[in-house]
């Protein structure tokens, strides 16, 4: 949970020492140089007007309850919902295509003339992107959006991820490449990262979670409620 300004400051500081910075700490296969791929083209308001909504690899009821309420509202207004991924109680009915790659592939190449005539949204979750073939799933989801004339949205679950991607806090090869040869790890509020026993770890954050327990040095950090900063939301909009 890191705002844009400290993410950029960390990038400048670490890269000046010859190091690497990586914000995709869960291994999400998000391409750093394509904002339409790591954010998408849809706005949250597009959900309200959508007649067709396709969910891929996400449980929005758990990952984004407010957005899920918008999907439910659209469903109550007559929208048709589809899901590729684990079945769950999302508080609305949906057509479950399946849980595997074949289910997603089966949706591509169909006749979607009826869908193209109406507003529609394809929503891709982080669960799908964290798979080893996440880039292929992303490409298929974007292809489905193109086939159906839909807006495309990547549903982020890390509040600081989009802003950090925007300022280039990424390393080729992702988190594994960034940690592979590190002697010192500066962990800025990434509580879910599992750092091996070798590197010296400096942790700066506000929560005594996994990151703090692994640290050799802990530096104090303000919680997001105690500081001013920019966060970029899942639709790519900066918020104070």
Model-derived features with residue positions:
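Cofactor-cradling patches in redox/metallo enzymes
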Residues: 1-8, 62-63
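Non-catalytic alpha/beta scaffold blocks inside enzyme catalytic domains
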Residues: 25-240
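Non-catalytic terminal/interface segments that mediate subunit docking, oligomerization
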Residues: 12-22
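Short amphipathic alpha-helical coiled-coil/interface segments
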Residues: 7-10, 14, 141-145
């Amino acid at each position: 949970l890191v705002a844009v300004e400290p993410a950029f400051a960390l990038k400048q500081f670490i890269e000046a020492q010859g190091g690497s910075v990586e914000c995709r700490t869960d291994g999400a296969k998000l391409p750093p140089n394509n904002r339409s791929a790591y954010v998408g083209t849809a706005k949250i308001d597009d959900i309200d007007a959508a007649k067709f909504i396709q969910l891929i690899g996400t449980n929005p009821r758990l990952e984004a309850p407010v957005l899920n309420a918008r999907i439910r509202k659209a469903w109550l207004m007559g929208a048709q919902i589809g899901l590729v991924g684990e079945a769950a109680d999302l508080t609305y009915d949906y057509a479950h295509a399946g849980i595997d790659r074949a289910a997603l592939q089966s949706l591509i190449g169909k006749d979607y003339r009826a869908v193209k005539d109406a507003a529609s949204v394809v929503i891709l979750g982080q669960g799908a992107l964290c798979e080893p073939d996440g880039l292929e799933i992303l490409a298929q989801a974007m292809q489905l959006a193109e086939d159906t004339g839909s807006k495309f949205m990547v549903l982020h679950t890390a509040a600081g991820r989009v802003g950090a991607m925007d300022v280039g806090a990424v390393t080729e090869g992702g988190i594994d490449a960034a940690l592979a040869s590190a002697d010192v790890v500066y962990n800025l509020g990434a509580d879910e990262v599992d750092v091996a026993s070798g590197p010296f770890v400096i942790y700066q954050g506000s929560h005594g979670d996994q990151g703090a327990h692994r640290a050799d040095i802990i530096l104090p950090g303000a919680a997001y409620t105690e500081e001013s900063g920019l966060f970029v939301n899942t639709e790519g909009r900066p918020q104070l």
